[in-house]
Amino acid sequence: MIDVVAAVIVKDNKFLITRRAPKLNLEGMWEFPGGKIEKGETPEEALKRELAEELEIETEVGNYIETSIYEYPNVTVKLMAYFATVISGEVKLSVHDEAKWISISEVENYKFAPADIPFIEK
């Protein structure tokens, strides 16, 4: 099982989603940004690090939302979601090929990675 964290970043009643780039697992699917927890890190530390590395933003991690466990064909992912706020920086893509701020009413227009879907339903 892989432990992963994701951020639900809300700004002006919209939240940030990112699209997985070609050649990545689940390419073309949308997700809440985040990444794998490294040994010795708390979920909150991992989330701050991943958002800085992948999107070049500094964030404040807020409340825990919930955990989603999803069994993909080759791996089981335990995904923990937290609210987060951007403190500084503008979103710059390095791993993903697109980022969008969307409203909850727009969610149905995007195909999300299966592990992220429970957070949308929340």
Language-model segments: residues:
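Conserved hydrophobic "DFG−1" position in protein kinase catalytic cores
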Residues: 9-10, 17, 84, 101
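Conserved beta-strand segments that form the floor/walls of ligand-binding pockets within enzyme
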Residues: 16, 31, 81
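NUDIX/MutT-family hydrolases
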Residues: 83, 92-122
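Conserved N-terminal beta-strand and adjoining loop/helix that marks the start
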Residues: 1-16, 36
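A conserved beta-turn-beta hairpin within the catalytic core of GNAT-like acetyltransferases
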Residues: 24-28, 57
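The catalytic Nudix box helix
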Residues: 32-64, 103
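Active-site-adjacent beta-strand/loop module that shapes the phosphate/pyrophosphate-binding cleft
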Residues: 58, 68-90, 98-100
